[in-house]
Amino acid sequence: MELVLVGKFLYNGRIIDGSIGVKDGKITKFSLRELKGDNKIKVEKGKIILPGLIDVHVHLRDFNETHKETIETGTKAAVHGGITTVFDMPNTKPPVMDEKTLKMREFLFKKKSYADYALGFLLAGNEPVKADFYKIFMGASTGGIYSKNFEEDYAKALDITSVHAEDYELISKYPERPPIVEISAIKKALNAARKVKKPLHICHVSTREGLKEILEANIPWVSFEVTPHHLFLTRKDYEKSKLLKVYPPLRDESDRRYLWEKLDNVPIIASDHAPHTLEDKERGAAGLPGLETEVALLLDAVNRGMLELWDVVEKMSLNPARIFRIKNKGWGEGKDADFAIVDMKKEWTIKAEEFYTKAGWTPYEGWKVRGKVIMTILRGEIVMEDDEVIGKPRGERIVKEGDD
């Protein structure tokens, strides 16, 4: 073995005391005893080895918006937060809607990314090219481009489609985007899914009724996500600070509680990391940074008994890898040796000044939390230790099932 991690790790829902062997950047063995190896990382008591986490909803800006975020700063933020794979949303400026722009995006990622990555392609009346996933906006959000015919665009997709479900007709009628805007779009998306029968992923579900619609429909090829900001914040927080403007908006306490009630039925948690500078936020930009806080908030919730640590593994590693058909990611022998080592006892205060994102602020400023990512390993190499991102960018594009 080139590398052996020794200590407690999560496996099949249980905490195991043993070791994990790594060779050529891949996991070779999970063992109950201490494996032999050239290089060992001994994980102390109170610390646990998790798989590297996958965030299927990240806006990394760059291109003409390098003042908001770059692939370099955004992926540094990712590994700082224990995220080893990011899904790059294509509503950039310019948007990723043709082969040339997609290739430009890949070129930048190859040079600048500290995390592994999946490349998205935006559909809004254009023809698709091969990408890792497709994104459709049913109503205008950041970037302003949305699909006038969701079903037609979704039917064209060559792989799984992630959809921002807010009804464009209702947005013009209700610009503050009350629950009906999301609920109506989710119903339309589910109706299209029944007809088209292609994999569909509904982003950032925020309402009780929207979630009910998805769960009752129970369509095998439809998945969905919830975000930490919809789990931890409400409309009352937005009323105190207009910086918390986001699409879909923060909801009432009853919606937030319902998301927690149904968390066992939620397959994926994703950040929807959407950085803007404070100046842009003060001018009304919608979106919240989240890559460096999402895992910490969830670890704190684990410590408070709101969910299990295994839930974090399922919703941010196993399920994303399975649903998005990522061949080289997950938690098993032969998968990439990506790890997030967490200290469940570490108490700390969230401060934006300690983060890598260019956003320069966080919705959770001053929150005291218990639980922290202390080391991130990407394909067998340490990329973050004790808040410091280490080495050069070495991110690679994910491998999809069937793409050999």
UniProtKB/Swiss-Prot annotation:
GO molecular function: allantoinase activity; dihydroorotase activity; zinc ion binding
Biological process annotations from GO: 'de novo' UMP biosynthetic process; purine nucleobase catabolic process
A Pfam family of this chain: Amidohydro_1
InterPro entries hit by this protein: Amidohydro-rel, DHOase, DHOase/Allantoinase_Hydrolase, Dihydroorotase_CS, Metal-dep_hydrolase_composite, Metal_Hydrolase
Keywords assigned by UniProt, alphabetized: Hydrolase, Metal-binding, Pyrimidine biosynthesis, Zinc
Origin: domain of life: Archaea
Residues annotated with N6-carboxylysine modification: 135
Transmembrane segments: none
Keyword Metal-binding attached: yes
Active site: 272
Top-level EC class as recorded in UniProt: hydrolase
Cofactor binding description: Binds 2 Zn(2+) ions per subunit.
Binding site for Zn(2+) 1: 57, 59, 135, 272
Enzyme Commission number, as recorded: 3.5.2.3
Residues binding substrate, per UniProt: 59-61, 91, 276, 286-287
Pathway: Pyrimidine metabolism; UMP biosynthesis via de novo pathway; (S)-dihydroorotate from bicarbonate: step 3/3
Cofactor(s) of this protein: Zn(2+)
GO CC list: cytoplasm
Catalytic activity: (S)-dihydroorotate + H2O = N-carbamoyl-L-aspartate + H(+)
Function, in words: Catalyzes the reversible cyclization of carbamoyl aspartate to dihydroorotate.
Family according to the record: Belongs to the metallo-dependent hydrolases superfamily. DHOase family. Class I DHOase subfamily.
Protein name: Dihydroorotase
Source organism: Pyrococcus abyssi (strain GE5 / Orsay)
Top-level taxonomy: Archaea, Methanobacteriati, Methanobacteriota, Thermococci, Thermococcales
